[in-house]
Amino acid sequence: MIKLTIDKAATSKGISSQKELRELIIEKTGVELRAATISDLYRNNKNQINREHLFTVMEALEITDFNEVLTIKRR
């Protein structure tokens, strides 16, 4: 099972809300992800992960290590 930990990664970078994360993404990457997309990533609500969305978030947070944004657990 893959679990996104974008909420923890954002908090560690001083981002305290999804709105702040969205603003940072726009500022750093120029990409306007929908608020619902960010919410799904933040809350780990998707069964599928869009790689481009994940890379965009990682770029905005200046993260290069996938271990900072996801964990893999055995069922």
Model regions: which residues?
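Residues within the alpha-helical elements of helix-turn-helix
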Residues: 24, 28, 60
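A short, Lys/Arg-rich alpha-helix, primarily the initiator
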Residues: 1-24
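Short amphipathic recognition helices of helix-turn-helix/homeodomain-type DNA-binding modules
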Residues: 68-75
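DNA major-groove recognition helix of helix-turn-helix/homeodomain DNA-binding modules
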Residues: 51-68
